[in-house]
């Protein structure tokens, strides 16, 4: 009998065989700018609360007055905050769920799933709530002396990280 290719740890609802792939094979980077002022909602990424309005999280807006050069993120897309914290020693990856759209600093790495029929968005939400991805990010991360907890991770390296994903 053929051995099934599944990880020891399973997320509820994902029962299929799994395969190893590069993140960039299942997602694409989002670099869309807020050039047409499609949104004025400045967001931040909190390890605890996800993508959240800066004014709600910090009790003030910390974004620049001119946010046309910020990334525009849409509901269902993901963002990676490279800042380390007690709750997120390797940063935090969160999906935009609370709002229809918002803007983020270009320091963040944004991405969306290439084929929602192939990869369930809930899988990535669950995956990035675990520490399973930390091994991969450790391989590419370097913390600069002047970065004060901001990991030096190039977008190209981020999308080269390996992950186990359910097969089609």
What are the residue ranges of the model-derived segments?
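A short glycine-rich beta-alpha junction/loop motif
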Residues: 3-7, 101-107, 142-167
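Non-catalytic DNA-recognition/assembly elements of restriction-modification systems
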Residues: 8-34, 160
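Localized chelating/binding microdomains
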Residues: 19-22, 135-138, 163-167
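Sequence-specific dsDNA recognition surfaces
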Residues: 24-35, 40, 44-79, 112-113
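A short beta-sheet element
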Residues: 68-133, 142, 146
């Amino acid at each position: 009998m053929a051995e099934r290719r599944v990880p020891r740890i399973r997320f509820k609802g994902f029962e299929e065989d799994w395969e190893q792939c590069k993140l960039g094979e299942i997602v694409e980077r989002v670099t869309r700018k807020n050039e047409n002022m499609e949104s004025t909602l400045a967001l931040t990424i909190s390890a605890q609360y996800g993508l959240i309005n800066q004014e709600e999280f910090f009790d003030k807006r910390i974004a620049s007055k001119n946010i046309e050069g910020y990334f525009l993120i849409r509901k269902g897309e993901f963002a990676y905050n490279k800042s380390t914290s007690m709750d997120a020693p390797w940063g935090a990856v969160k999906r935009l769920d609370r709002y229809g759209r918002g803007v983020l600093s270009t320091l963040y790495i944004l991405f969306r799933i290439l084929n929602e029929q192939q990869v369930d968005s809930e899988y990535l939400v669950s995956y990035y709530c675990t520490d399973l991805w930390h091994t991969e990010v450790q391989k590419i991360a370097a913390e600069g002396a002047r970065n004060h907890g901001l990991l030096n991770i190039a977008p190209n390296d981020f999308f080269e990280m390996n992950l186990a994903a359910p097969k089609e």
